[in-house]
């Protein structure tokens, strides 16, 4: 076998491979003999059919199969010989394929980028200095009260904190548009659910009032046909409601699974949950900055094959979120996923290089700690830990999580780390 390697654009490579004719012809002959020996032919005893007849009937198909097998096998031998690491399946193209002549073919494919980590010392990480304060717990209790609130109709004007039930019809240039019409639509005033100006137009209105408002859809509105358009809404207020918050008593506390200890026990449970969420949020914020810095300092080419694979993964995940229709999800345009897919591939390649450069191995104690911490969110943590320990696939997933955390720790060890005081709400409400 003769092999030459061509470097094409970017990460693309081409192997030019020559296989001696004898290799092909010997393989074809062996397969034809196998057919003659084991297949029945009319008018002949098994194994007694003439080889010329077998070759005439099956020679062409057998040769095509053999060529495919030979190209695949010799490609693998070639990349091992040349120490090449393909990032995806090759595309084969025969160049010389005459019977009795050497087989000449090429294989075009992408390789993984060569990554040399740099700039870890330039990465800046602001570690949030934050704790759960009494005021944060009280605010969370109020949020829980609002979630359990009831609404009572009142003879008052619409304002922030109240809820209105409205009918509305939207139009642009006098024409109604799709999605711009509703009846008995519940709208909590001050929640910011509607486009700018919509709630302002309802402010101060009372039950039975009918009126029109003029608004403009934002330029970044999700519906392409409405972006930046001026619209008119005809609105009728059917009723105005005020929120009735439940009292902080044992009945309220019991709704959250706290059987004893009253409101103090609920506050303690809420604080514990908030502290667990806060710890994870701090970890996520640090990880996000470390990865952002890693990507910024290390620009690399990305194999298109890996991006395609990741796009398919994202499509399948989308299908699971939206009813399991994989076929429909696979038809979604790749542009929806391309940026996220490329980012995930880049991060994966760079973190892999961090792991390699620092010779990191999975810390089994860290794996146990991650599982134990995660299990505290469940009613029976011991049962959860046991379930994970008895499931090898879940354990391998957790080992990957632990190894990634070890890689992040390695980045942070070389980065410029400072602390910044923030409140609980500031951190938890930061955009992703």
From Swiss-Prot:
Record GO cellular component, one term: cytoplasm
Which keywords label this protein?
Answer: Cell cycle, Cell division, Chaperone, Cytoplasm, Isomerase, Rotamase
| Biological-process GO terms, alphabetical | 'de novo' cotranslational protein folding; cell division; chaperone-mediated protein folding; protein transport; protein unfolding
Q: What are the EC numbers?
A: 5.2.1.8
Q: Which GO terms describe its molecular function?
A: peptidyl-prolyl cis-trans isomerase activity; protein folding chaperone; ribosome binding
Q: Where in the cell is it found?
A: Cytoplasm
Role description: Involved in protein export. Acts as a chaperone by maintaining the newly synthesized protein in an open conformation. Functions as a peptidyl-prolyl cis-trans isomerase.
What is the name attached to this protein's record?
A: Trigger factor
**Record organism:** Vibrio vulnificus (strain CMCP6)
- Output the lineage of the source organism: Bacteria, Pseudomonadati, Pseudomonadota, Gammaproteobacteria, Vibrionales
